[in-house]
UniProtKB/Swiss-Prot annotation:
It comes from Shewanella amazonensis (strain ATCC BAA-1098 / SB2B). One of the early assembly proteins it binds 23S rRNA. One of the proteins that surrounds the polypeptide exit tunnel on the outside of the ribosome. Forms the main docking site for trigger factor binding to the ribosome. The gene is rplW. HAMAP family: Ribosomal_uL23_B. This is Large ribosomal subunit protein uL23. GO terms for cellular component: ribonucleoprotein complex; ribosome. GO terms for biological process: translation. Pfam families: Ribosomal_L23. GO terms for molecular function: rRNA binding; structural constituent of ribosome. Belongs to the universal ribosomal protein uL23 family.
Length: 100
């Protein structure tokens, strides 16, 4: 079993983009920005615990940081990890959470 404090550090934020919105509508998949060292099993456990939904599958990828310039200096942004979490049929995550 994964410790609860680790589960809280795995998911950093939902990743909102045009592609993630299209994927969410078509395939019941939610996209998260996750810790770079997070495993698929940790991501699955964290989503199931935090959002109380059943997860059908997890796919991950690492985005390489871009090279940026500030005058003559060249720097590089950090690499980051993205997770596509497919939810079980009938499950849904509401990020707004506003109940009237």
């Amino acid at each position: 079993m994964i410790r609860e404090e680790r589960l809280l550090k795995v998911i950093l934020a939902p990743h909102i983009s045009e592609k993630s919105t299209v994927v969410a509508e078509k395939t019941n998949t939610v996209v998260f920005r996750v810790a770079i060292d997070a495993t698929k099993s940790e991501i699955k456990a964290a989503v199931e615990k935090l959002f109380e939904v059943e997860v059908a599958g997890v796919r991950t990828l690492i985005n390489k940081g871009k090279t940026k310039r500030h005058g003559a200096r060249v720097g590089r942004r950090s690499d980051w990890k993205k997770a596509y979490v497919t939810l079980a049929a009938g499950a849904d995550i509401d990020f707004v959470g506003a109940e009237a």
